[in-house]
Amino acid sequence: ECRKMFGGCSVDSDCCAHLGCKPTLKYCAWDGT
């Protein structure tokens, strides 16, 4: 199950489509796509 916006993550693949993991803050955010 993918993480939604601002969900916790460790890598980009933890996040839903169009989201990427922010490594310093450890949450999913819009990746610009």
Swiss-Prot record:
What superkingdom does the record give?
Eukaryota
What Pfam family does this protein match (any one)? Toxin_12
Q: Tell me the tissue specificity.
A: Expressed by the venom gland.
Q: What is the disulfide pattern of this chain?
A: C2-C16, C9-C21, C15-C28
Q: Name one GO cellular component term.
A: extracellular region
Stored SUPFAM superfamilies:
omega toxin-like
Quoted from the entry, the domain comment is: The presence of a 'disulfide through disulfide knot' structurally defines this protein as a knottin.
Q: What does it do? A: Gating modifier of Kv2.1/KCNB1 channels.
Q: Which family does it belong to?
A: Belongs to the neurotoxin 10 (Hwtx-1) family. 28 (Jztx-11) subfamily.
Q: What name goes with this protein? A: Kappa-theraphotoxin-Pg2a
